[in-house]
């Protein structure tokens, strides 16, 4: 197996390898890579305008004319008055596809806008529904409050009515018992005698022989906040200058007790 040429060269420089094997020659096969469909000879013979070339279309086997600057094509020569210069079918398909794609994107964008608008409308409708439910709830609460107040008022009226009935029944029962006692008494009581008895005075009452007011059963009894001085507090007139006077400490204690009682009341 022959050594590579590079290794042979390094070994030869070091003096290890004395004989260099010749590098094998490669066979070069010439191929025609010229697949340019432009017919330069026909272009020169027809005298086409600048930038115009006659090109062979391998798909249909017919020639057409092509402008290299504008990339426009025509089936007829540019010198022919019936020639129509347009874009190639490939360009037209590409532009149409781009236009359709752009149109689809615009439609999609419009649909998204409509969807967004619909969602906003739905959100607004939900807000209205929520507001309506809130109003309905407030109305129900208000009606419930009114019903509760009405029930409480009706209950109070019934309680007052029952209380009035009870009071009337008690008064009626009391009056019946009074009449029954009068009927069961051994002799009828005269109201005039009762009033005359009330008008009579006790001979021992000071009001029967002096200007003193008529007393009651509690007149003359010691009061709770009254100082115990031993003096006659019922005396009036000339007897007002009586002895002994209460002590200053008793007066202060009585005043303090009276003010305390007034504050509690």
Swiss-Prot record:
Compartment annotation: Nucleus; Nucleus speckle; Cytoplasmic granule
Matches recorded under PROSITE patterns: WW_DOMAIN_2
Annotated phenotype, changing residue 251 to D: Abolishes interaction with TXNL4A
Phosphoserine: modified positions: 94, 247
One annotated Gene Ontology cellular component of this protein: nucleus
GO MF annotations in UniProt: DNA binding; double-stranded DNA binding; ribonucleoprotein complex binding; transcription coactivator activity
InterPro entries (alphabetical): WW_dom (IPR001202), WW_dom_sf (IPR036020)
Impact reported for residue 75 to A: No effect on transcriptional activation. Reduces transcriptional activation. Abolishes transcriptional activation
Spans annotated as Important for interaction with TXNL4A: 245-255
Region ranges (3 X 2 AA tandem repeats of [DE]-R): 139-144
Region (7 X 2 AA tandem repeats of [DE]-R): 150-163
Biased composition (Basic and acidic residues): 99-175
Main location: nucleus
WW domain location: 46-80
GO biological-process terms attached to the record: activation of innate immune response; alternative mRNA splicing, via spliceosome; cellular response to exogenous dsRNA; defense response to virus; innate immune response; neuron projection development; positive regulation of defense response to virus by host; positive regulation of type I interferon production
UniProt superkingdom: Eukaryota
Positions annotated as Sequence repeat: 104-110, 111-117, 118-124, 125-131, 132-138, 139-140, 141-142, 143-144, 150-151, 152-153, 154-155, 156-157, 158-159, 160-161, 162-163
Clinical condition linked: Renpenning syndrome 1: An X-linked syndrome characterized by intellectual disability, microcephaly, short stature, and small testes. The craniofacies tends to be narrow and tall with upslanting palpebral fissures, abnormal nasal configuration, cupped ears, and short philtrum. The nose may appear long or bulbous, with overhanging columella. Less consistent manifestations include ocular colobomas, cardiac malformations, cleft palate, and anal anomalies.
Free-text note regarding domains: The WW domain may play a role as a transcriptional activator directly or via association with the transcription machinery. The WW domain mediates interaction with WBP11, ATN1, SF3B1 and the C-terminal domain of the RNA polymerase II large subunit.
Protein task: Intrinsically disordered protein that acts as a scaffold, and which is involved in different processes, such as pre-mRNA splicing, transcription regulation, innate immunity and neuron development. Interacts with splicing-related factors via the intrinsically disordered region and regulates alternative splicing of target pre-mRNA species. May suppress the ability of POU3F2 to transactivate the DRD1 gene in a POU3F2 dependent manner. Can activate transcription directly or via association with the transcription machinery. May be involved in ATXN1 mutant-induced cell death.
Summary of subunit composition and partner proteins: Interacts with POU3F2/Brn-2, ATXN1, TXNL4A, HTT and AR. Interaction with ATXN1 correlates positively with the length of the polyglutamine tract. Interacts with RNA polymerase II large subunit in a phosphorylation-dependent manner. Forms a ternary complex with ATXN1 mutant and phosphorylated RNA polymerase II. Interacts (via C-terminus) with TXNL4A and CD2BP2. Interacts (via WW domain) with ATN1 and SF3B1, and may interact with additional splice factors. Interacts (via WW domain) with WBP11; Leading to reduce interaction between PQBP1 and TXNL4A. Interacts with CAPRIN1. Interacts with DDX1.
PANTHER family: POLYGLUTAMINE BINDING PROTEIN 1/MARVEL MEMBRANE-ASSOCIATING DOMAIN CONTAINING 3 (PTHR21737), POLYGLUTAMINE-BINDING PROTEIN 1 (PTHR21737:SF3)
Name of the protein in its database record: Polyglutamine-binding protein 1
Organism, as annotated: Homo sapiens (Human)
Gene: PQBP1
């Amino acid at each position: 197996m022959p050594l590579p040429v590079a290794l042979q060269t390094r070994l030869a420089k070091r003096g290890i390898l004395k004989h260099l094997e010749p590098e094998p020659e490669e066979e070069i096969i010439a191929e025609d890579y010229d697949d340019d469909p432009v017919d330069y000879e026909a272009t020169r013979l027809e005298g086409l305008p600048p930038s115009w070339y006659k090109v062979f279309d391998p798909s249909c086997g017919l020639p057409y004319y092509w402008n290299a600057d504008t990339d426009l094509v025509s089936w007829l020569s540019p010198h022919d008055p019936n020639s129509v210069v347009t874009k190639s079918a490939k360009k037209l398909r590409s532009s149409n596809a781009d236009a359709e794609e752009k149109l689809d994107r615009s439609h999609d964008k419009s649909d998204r806008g409509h969807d967004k608008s619909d969602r906003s409308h739905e959100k607004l409708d939900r807000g209205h529904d929520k507001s309506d439910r809130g109003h309905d709830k407030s109305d129900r609460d208000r009606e419930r409050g009114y019903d509760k107040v009405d029930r409480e008022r009706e209950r109070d009226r019934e309680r007052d009515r029952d209380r009035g009935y009870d009071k009337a029944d008690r008064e009626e029962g009391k009056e019946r018992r009074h009449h029954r006692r009068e009927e069961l008494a051994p002799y009828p009581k005269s109201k005039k005698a009762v009033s005359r008895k009330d008008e009579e005075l006790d001979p021992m009452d000071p009001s029967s022989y002096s200007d003193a007011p008529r007393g009651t059963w509690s007149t003359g009894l010691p009061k709770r906040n009254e100082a115990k001085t031993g003096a006659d507090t019922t005396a009036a007139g000339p007897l007002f200058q009586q002895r002994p006077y209460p002590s200053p400490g008793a007066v202060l204690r009585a005043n303090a007790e009276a003010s305390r009682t007034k504050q509690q009341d």
